[in-house]
């Protein structure tokens, strides 16, 4: 066992007390990204090593692996703690997204080590989708590169507001303050093009030598700021989901017996309490919350992020993919939306194609009406294209087979994030972030009932040879 972990358990008074203490620590999810060979895996290995999160057998194995696959001569190659795939060790690069967990006395952490190569952009986007902070590594010898800009853009596109720019390999530039200042100014000039109100920090460090990672560097007396670990431990993440409107996507209808009917899922945002009036979309039927059932028993009130089962006072028709929200909120269903897409398939995305999509437990079909532009993520310019290639990022117009209830991704990632699924292979081929829902269903709802709209979508989906027109716009 890790001796530090054993000491912590002893100090807490046993395993059970230690586990309870861990549960009450805040959790920070962050990723490391940057250009190839900037030292991302080495940095994570250094964090694990200096916070004493490595077990004795892992340390022994690391000594042996460093001799066979290491790139640091006689020193320990800490990157091998993270690069687990054989291909990664042989090439000395990161390919897959590697997740690691560690904790300190102040906070728990989940790290996503993402690849730096451009052909693995889809892997990087996958890792960033669940993170709240991004560490952007920059090689002090090379400065801000195109891949640095690319990863910065993807991180902000996926809703990350906290960026830590770690200027690595300071030992190779003699710990020069001038180099640090120049790179800092270059990045701030570029960051002015990034969307959103960002919190950007800068830390000069050497992942290989451990300078300013978990302890203050004696080689850089000119830097008086926080170490990287101190930044991670103290950064305040604004989790605003509790203050947002209630969103409860139904994942499962729970019917264990004739006397119980509950709707299970995770509360995506807001809060819900017993007695609250709620509305079911897209049907619009209203009811009251009779019970809130959790693993620990019934609760009177729950908040965003909790897995719950809601029991309503009325027996109404609710199925997987329906959305519950506060009854007094007006959220119209939409038939179309503009979506920021990260394409992940060899076959490019082209106008006219149809895909199955999945969003907040709801599975339906969407057609690509057009591609407005592709983003050149090396310089953040937009260009017109006929299709979106592998690893391409662009703004795409979609039309759905049925009205959906959507939020902008920046407002709610659960009800604003979707995936594209190939209808033949059932493989996930793309990820989408709702840029702007296009309210068309509202205008048509006065002319057609919800049943007529659903029947129309059903006929067009299964009997296209009938030539039925789209009631929401004859598309």
UniProtKB/Swiss-Prot annotation:
Chain spans, region G1: 34-41
Listed pathway(s): Sulfur metabolism; hydrogen sulfide biosynthesis; sulfite from sulfate: step 1/3
Statement: the UniProt record of this protein carries the keyword Nucleotide-binding: yes
Domain tr-type G: 25-239
One Pfam family, short name: GTP-eEF1A_C
Catalysed transformations (reactions): sulfate + ATP + H(+) = adenosine 5'-phosphosulfate + diphosphate
UniProt entry tagged with the keyword Nucleotide-binding: yes
GO BP of this protein: hydrogen sulfide biosynthetic process; sulfate assimilation
Positions of the UniProt region annotated as G4: 168-171
Residue span of region G3: 113-116
Annotated segments matching region G2: 92-96
Top-rank taxon, per record: Bacteria
Binding site for GTP: 34-41, 113-117, 168-171
Functional description taken from the UniProt entry: With CysD forms the ATP sulfurylase (ATPS) that catalyzes the adenylation of sulfate producing adenosine 5'-phosphosulfate (APS) and diphosphate, the first enzymatic step in sulfur assimilation pathway. APS synthesis involves the formation of a high-energy phosphoric-sulfuric acid anhydride bond driven by GTP hydrolysis by CysN coupled to ATP hydrolysis by CysD.
Subunit structure: Heterodimer composed of CysD, the smaller subunit, and CysN.
The family this protein is said to belong to: Belongs to the TRAFAC class translation factor GTPase superfamily. Classic translation factor GTPase family. CysN/NodQ subfamily.
Record's protein name: Sulfate adenylyltransferase subunit 1
